[in-house]
């Protein structure tokens, strides 16, 4: 909808619709408050509420026209076989697949759990090896990288590099819910203990950090902490040794925590180096 109306899309997506689910406003990210000549979400919602009360018929008419135009714009030119569509989708993902580090494309690189779930189900349906290999390598590389929180569990929004090392440190509920599902389905498919471990740790993170006291869940955690982006997730060897004592050295070697650091002078814990101290659950290769 956003791409069709505005020429481009993105996430988060802001769509305002009628009760009949017909859109009349669509945008990507909007700040909470208005600033720099850009309307914020709070002001927008108040403006739309006033407009809805005073000119509901006009908004409903506009929404209907947009919906009719979108249906015409997106109508298939001809009947297409479902098997042909799924094969085309698999081929497109295979074309953009990163053989070395998993995932799709270069950088920034998103987990794209929905693509992984599709490929797993496609592999099961068609009994093909390549889609399953793409999924397993991607799940493994994401777990090893800094996009995965090796201490608190859960995944960051995306990686700023191809190797999954340096994430944008925001954590979102929907990403982690979908990734927990992807790792769970991978465990059900191959019974590799690592997939179950990651799924459980991710769900534990959601229940511990994102569950609201009054019920429901928060949508995520901001990337900023301690005044800087990712400060909560960065460590020095001295900080680790203050907590772990003599075991701190082993931890630092395992998780690539060094004096020079790998991110602005500090270290993002990761298992990309495959050191001898690395904790690798049963079934990891």
Place the predicted regions along the sequence by residue.
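Replace the tail clause
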Residues: 1-285
